[in-house]
C-alpha cells in the first residue's frame, strides 16, 4: 500500500508551521489508523478530544497506541486515573530498554554536547560567555533519568553540579552521586548554566528567571512546550534580542541590554532543536522497544488504560541489541522460584 506521509512537500514559512501541524495531525487521524506510535501523546489526546469518532469504542478504527516519552506518559496517567483513556496504551517510555538508555545516556550526552557547542561561538563570547564546561556552576532541575544523565555528563567535563529536586530521595541520591542539592531560590543566583530536565510546564517561571544573574545561560533538556515561562516574561514587558542562531538575550524592558539571561534554542529541547539529537545507538533501542510494543498490541487484546511492557519484551530488545553490538548475556537460567531466590525459602541460617 505504500506509506502515507502527512507533511509539507516543500519548504514552508515559520509562521505557517503551527497551522500545518494541526492540519496534518487531523489528517493522520482521519486516515483511520488502527494503531498509533506517539511521541508526547499529542495524537492520542487529539483523538480523545476533537476527533473522538476515530476511536474504536465510537465505531472508528483506532484501537491501541504506544507512547514514547515521559511527557506523553504523564497526561495519559491522568487520563487513565479519570477514566478518560478509551484506548489501551503501552508506555514504551517506561521500559528499561528506553528509559535507561535513550533518556539517561542519549539525552544526557546530547544536551551537554549541544550546550557546550552553542556556547563555543564568537557570538557567545561577545555576549560575555566563556566557552567550556570545566569549572562552571551548572544547576540541573530535576533528577530523573534525563537530569541524572545531564548531571553525569556535565560533571565528567568538569562542571560543578547543583541539583534542584522536589523528591527528597532523589535529592539525596544526587548528593551521594557527588553533587550538591539545593532549593531553586538558593541555586539559581550562582548558576552559570541552568538546565531544566523536568518535562514540567513552567518549571522556570518569571519569578525563578528573575533570580538569574546577568548572562546566565538557560536550556531545556528533552522538554515540553513552555517549560520556561516565556509567556509570563512577555506579559511583564520583557524583551528578547537575538544574538546568534539559537541564542537570545531576555531582558526587562527598562534594563540595559547586558543585564538579562541567555536562552538557548528558544526554550525548546536543546538537543533536538539546536543540535544533532540523541546518538543512534540509543535511539535504536527506543525504536525497537516501540516495535515490540506494537507486536504485543497486534497479538494481545488489552483493556483501555495505560500498560507497561513485560520483562520478556525488554529482554527481547536487549538480547537483539547485545547480539548487534557483539555482546551477550549470561546464558545460565535463574532458579525459577518466585522472587528468584537460589535456595528454597525454608533454608535459613537458624534452621535446626
Q: For the regions a protein language model found, what residue spans apply to each?
A:
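Glycine/serine-rich phosphate-binding loop and adjoining beta1-alpha1 elements at the start
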Residues: 2-134
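NAD(P)-binding Rossmann-fold cofactor-contacting core
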Residues: 92, 155-177
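A short helix->loop->beta-strand "cap" motif at the edges of active sites that frequently abuts
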Residues: 3, 60, 85-87, 158-159, ...
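Hydrophobic/small residue at the entry helix of a nucleotide-binding pocket
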Residues: 146
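ADP-ribose/adenylate-binding Rossmann-like module
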Residues: 35-39, 52-71, 200, 209-251, ...
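Short acidic low-complexity segments
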Residues: 178-191
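Adenosine-phosphate binding glycine-rich loop
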Residues: 88-127, 230-339, 344
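Hydrophobic Val/Ile/Leu positions in short beta-strands of Rossmann-like dinucleotide-binding domains
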Residues: 138-141
